[in-house]
């Protein structure tokens, strides 16, 4: 037990010793003139209730990878290489190491823009983002993005502009209980897209085979002097391919349901077994959920290697 502990202590000591040596290497020797190594990137917010972790994915450039939360071993390994790229040792060190994260001001600007857009999409319509660059020793720089979200806007009213009368009548009957957007809730662009998907799901489950969410759009207008937004949902008519005329969306009903085999035409299972695993039923409106369930059911049958459901 004592020998094992001594061995573990030696390994750990060697690792930290190597880390110290590598950390002492000049990591700025490959930097072009007037360039800076991106040392650290930080997010701050004037609103302390803001979840900063939700905005970290918008950071386009970060510093080099750290090991043990302290040492940039991959960067230091890269820095051990000489400038003669023809030598194998230099090539090897560069391949296993990590290139210096040279500050790219274009990416910094893009990050600031993306962060501001993300805040506005989350309902902070007056949001701005500032950047602060702090140059530290040895040509290194720390970048801080300061989020200034401002007040959160809320929905004042939701209006529906449905240009297809048949869909308007059907939605009035089947959709009101499923409506998500309501007066008083925080404005959020993500929720608008979720509403498009919900309406699309309702319609494709009720016969509208060709309907997709691109038929739905939104307009949002802020109320002057208030932190409120009026929302209008627009649902357009159907436009056939290669046509300039709009028509009503067609609702389809399932006719007959038939089964065919593969190349030899032979069914892998009895028709009764296939019918038991088929959610699509004759005489019912087309339903995208039933289509997915049928694919899932057939996928669990070992005798069936491939399923292709076609509508004609």
Give residue spans per PLM region.
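Interaction-mediating elements
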Residues: 2, 26-301, 306
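Gram-negative bacterial Sec-dependent N-terminal signal peptides
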Residues: 10-19
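C-terminal motif of bacterial Sec signal peptides marking the signal peptidase cleavage site
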Residues: 20-24
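Bacterial N-terminal signal peptides that target proteins for export
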Residues: 2-11
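Gly/Pro-rich turn-and-neighbor structural signature
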Residues: 310-311
